[in-house]
Amino acid sequence: MEFQAVVMAVGGGSRMTDLTSSIPKPLLPVGNKPLIWYPLNLLERVGFEEVIVITTKDVQKALCADFNKMKMKLDIVCIPDEADMGTADSLRHIYQKLKTDVLVLSCDLITDVALHEVVDLFRAHDASLAMLMRKGQESLEPVPGQKGKKKAVEQRDFVGVDSTGKRLLFMANEADLDEELIIKGSILQKHPRIRFHTGLVDAHLYCLKKYVVDFLMENKSITSIRSELIPYLVRKQFSSASSQQGQEEKEEDLKKKELKSLDIYSFIKEANTLTLAPYDTCWNACRGDSWEGLSRSQVRCYVHIMKEGLCSRVSTLGLYMEANRQVSKLLPVICPEESLIHSSAQIVSKHMVGADSLIGPDTQVGEKSSIKHSVIGSSCVIRDRVTVTNCLLMNSVTVEEGSNIQSSIICNDAVIEKGADIKNCLIGSGQRIEAKAKRVNVIVGNDQFLEI
């Protein structure tokens, strides 16, 4: 096996707690499928026969119940409930299972990327790391319950690449930078022209050499792949031979002192050094690198920047809504055998359901009810003359006659009574909105009614 695939499904969704307080993030519905289904489906489509899923006991129960139809074997590993593990910690937790290079994905990645483009980059350059990034995009649609709420300032990443746009030369978050951007002279000697991007977003898909995982195992101070390991690997490129030799001498001293923190070069063996023969066919792709440069610089980092297609990380409430808006374009491509409207759904006025809407199994839609740009879950009841526009209704939601719902999320088992008018709201699980009530820009949860 060339790669072992690992899906990280541990994070609690700290930036969308209004949803994840009642539904674990990996199980949040997107297009009537659990969020974690998308990275698992991506792996299955490209031929993986087994994947390691690192998650919690709550998610494990759902995976065992709902994913038994997958051809791919799921090796589910639960972390202790009390553990506060980062992504690097999680890799260390399954270290004994990892025997080859590793492909790591986040459970919140939804993409139609041609995965081989990232993997081929990793292979062709014998890279230590190959990762996926996309151009950042802002949704113009309102976020339910967020109007007037101060938006968190997103910290940009400064990403430097070579003339091919593939070699990753510099990566740092602006929060970690001073007023000046300092580039090592050893990088500029080999790459005098560096192209910087500030509008790229990390998709959290990484190919990692096995020796990188070995390095992580011995360097327990690194807790995050994204914010600690990757910047470290990028910085370690183009280390001079003398500095490497000096490091080796230093490591001998460290071993004598039984200290555990070791440099990445301690874990790069001769077998990992690039040999020219297996890569003759793709050597033309290495235009920015010479054989001499590659052989000396054993740590090599590459990035595939996705310019077209769908690539979204569902890490905020706004991105969650946007994913549900976009998924009607993706599902017919990756699941052509499935209809957007389930065959068991009962719809009286079918012509009033938009072509870009999804309706789940056993849902009933009454006469003259309009559903546009929306996702409706399973076992919902939508009575007559209801209007649903640009919304997500989860499972077992009841909407009584004459109600109007716009740009909102209605969670499981909620009831919207007759004639209610709801706009830009998040209605929590099991909540009831009384008849003819008007709600605008609010979050309604357990013992909660927040006017934003």
Swiss-Prot record:
GO terms for biological process: cytoplasmic translational initiation; oligodendrocyte development; T cell receptor signaling pathway; translational initiation. One of its GO terms (cellular component) is guanyl-nucleotide exchange factor complex. InterPro entries: eIF2B_gamma (IPR051960), NTP_transferase_dom (IPR005835), Nucleotide-diphossugar_trans (IPR029044). Gene3D superfamilies: Hexapeptide repeat proteins, Spore Coat Polysaccharide Biosynthesis Protein SpsA, Chain A. Activated by the chemical integrated stress response (ISR) inhibitor ISRIB which stimulates guanine nucleotide exchange factor activity for both phosphorylated and unphosphorylated eIF2. The keyword Phosphoprotein applies. GO terms for molecular function: guanyl-nucleotide exchange factor activity; translation initiation factor activity. The keyword Iron-sulfur does not apply. Disulfide bonds: none annotated. Its main location: cytoplasm. Pfam families: LbH_EIF2B (PF25084), NTP_transferase (PF00483). The modification Phosphoserine is found at residue 261. Keywords: Acetylation, Cytoplasm, Initiation factor, Phosphoprotein, Protein biosynthesis. Coiled coil: none annotated. It is found in: Cytoplasm, Cytosol. The modification N-acetylmethionine is found at residue 1. Acts as a component of the translation initiation factor 2B (eIF2B) complex, which catalyzes the exchange of GDP for GTP on the eukaryotic initiation factor 2 (eIF2) complex gamma subunit. Its guanine nucleotide exchange factor activity is repressed when bound to eIF2 complex phosphorylated on the alpha subunit, thereby limiting the amount of methionyl-initiator methionine tRNA available to the ribosome and consequently global translation is repressed. Component of the translation initiation factor 2B (eIF2B) complex which is a heterodecamer of two sets of five different subunits: alpha, beta, gamma, delta and epsilon. Subunits alpha, beta and delta comprise a regulatory subcomplex and subunits epsilon and gamma comprise a catalytic subcomplex. Within the complex, the hexameric regulatory complex resides at the center, with the two heterodimeric catalytic subcomplexes bound on opposite sides. Belongs to the eIF-2B gamma/epsilon subunits family. This is Translation initiation factor eIF2B subunit gamma.
